Amino acid sequence: MENTPHIGLETESIAIFTLFAIAGLLIDLWAHRADKPISLKAATFWSLFWVAVGASFGGFMYIHFSPEVASLYFAGYAFEMALSVDNLFAIMAVFAWFGIKSGFTHRVLYWGVLGAVVFRLIFVLIGTGLFSLGAYVEFVFAFMVALSAVLMINKKDNDGMSDFSNHPAYKFVKFFVPLYPKLVGHNFFVSNAHVQEELKKEENKHIVLKRKGLVYATPLFLCLAIVETSDVMFAFDSVPAVIAVSKDPFIVYSCMIFAILGLRSMYFILDALRNALIYLEKAVIVLLFFVAFKLVA
């Protein structure tokens, strides 16, 4: 891999990055404070909003550092957005299996994104740090990315019909917390007292709790756990891909985070246009092979 600029961690840069990210999140959270379905028009607006936020930070990188640094930032941003498509399709399958209403999906995606912000930081610091061990690390990363592309080619198109009750995250939550099998508003957890009140309702007479406890996890939390796990697995593709653009941790992390923050709105666009985007996954596979080649070229 060719040498790329290393800008390090400046207090001013970190402060500006944090300001942009938190301000955008607060505006987004306020706008979506109600559990209402998000229309295609609204999703498009908020996708453009987050693109504008990400582009504005790219402008800061251009002015504060250099055009080359800004170009690396935008290249990494584009890679992250493109590679996120497959992860979003996987999330659609999770929501479909759990029967999550569109009004509640934004809440799951919001908390999922916050988790991704933390996990990406860990992955980026580890990933960029590994390159100090030697050039062979690039071949390991290239193999991981190429393997992901091969797995995407070979996987069966189950159209969201996977049984997610066998998912490791589902079993992990089930092991530690009793489950209540029905949605209770947008709650991730419900108290035992609330569950007992729910069980008194005629439509819930058939429900038999396998375990009892003070607190119960709802299907919405199970959905969040699986989405979060899916994102961690996805990071094994996306982090090496963006590191193929730049080894600098601040460039890598900032471009990935601003791309991720716009994914919730992008999800609703892809969900609405899913049938018209049948070639997107193939494009992602091609991009993964390109990234694998770039890592070793």
Task: Map each language-model feature to its residues.
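Multi-pass alpha-helical transmembrane bundle typical of ion/small-solute transporters
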Residues: 1-297
